[in-house]
Amino acid sequence: MKAKSYKLKYVPTVQQLRDAGFRPGGSWMHENAFMFAERRFAYELSVSICFFPDLGVWDDFYNILVLDEEFGQPYTPFYSENYKKDIKGFPVLEYCIRQYNDFLDSFDFLE
């Protein structure tokens, strides 16, 4: 199981973001966050994605946060030496990666 890399297929409009479930805010992810969407799932984890006011400025490291909700900090096993590497034998991390990929795959403006 490996976290995919994502980039913008096209720059979405504010209305397209709203239609995709984005809401204003997201400052816990980045001080310049303008709109965000998130998915919470088991094991007290969540995946959030944000856009800055310049919607074309986006990458899959600075604009996405996998958060350990219990401790209120980035989920370290996702980011540390495991970041975007093939993971086997760690069920919680594999589940997290699957949720990350499924959530980001749901947006038609990402590829």
Per-segment meaning from a language model:
Residues 3-26:
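Amphipathic alpha-helical segments
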